[in-house]
Amino acid sequence: MRKTYLLGALIAVFALFMQSSAVLAAEKDPWTWLSSNDKYSKFYAPASVRVVSSVMKKRQKTPVATELEAEIKTSFSYAGAEETIRNYNIKHVIKDPGKLAYAVARVRVYPQNRILRYLSETFYDAAGNILWSKGEGREKEMNSQSFDEEFYAAIVDVVFRQGELDRMRADDRWITLWSDESTAGVKTLVTADMSTMRREKDNLIFWAWTEVTDKEGNTVEIKFDKRAVNLPQGTERIISGRYWAPGAGWQELDDGYEGAYRMIAKSTPEERGLMRLRAFADGYGTWVNRYRID
């Protein structure tokens, strides 16, 4: 009996030790890995996420968060450090890219308009010594071309748990709105980014990618734009975007309407896209209305 009791006590002590070790390890390393490539590894600290502002919607008992803050971390390979130093224009401060190991930043996120702002950022060497730091940065809207999009999605998911990160990484993130081929063999394909879709009153707002190829299959035009489609009225407007053409590279997009709404003509490929957007908004109402406060 004494041996059984002693064995049980030892097992209990061992289990307590293992549990305590796990807790200590978690406390020492608050970072959760998000992704890595040959230049960067991205992490965020879930325990650091907090709501700093919220609003109460009519006929709802719980407030909706409108501003979040959190800490993020980026570690660098030599190539990533070199690129970062160049982008920040700090070669006079960090002369050797090999010394830049990682950066920690505090960011503020605005879920309703997919905005992320750096409040502060500090660069470190491998030993944890500060190499350089900066204060508040500009606001950046998150889309498929944004370096910080994974940070944004992970932070928002901590509060809302709507699957922002999963949708961003999904194979069907982009859906075809419409495609068309002219008699000359020129093909146009327009796709919409479901991860950016949100409803604001009658408008469905999202980022779209338009690609035009000639009869030989060469890409002759690309448009990447944020647009608002008024679903009941069947109108749309370009909010912002960029345009690419061979020899010209990427430029700011000028749609010729100066941001005004235009009617989507009937019996056109664009109307097929409108019908698909209406169906999507009806079928995925929870998704397009997430975080909504209007």
Task: Tell what function each PLM region has.
Residues 10-14, 276:
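N-terminal leader/targeting signatures
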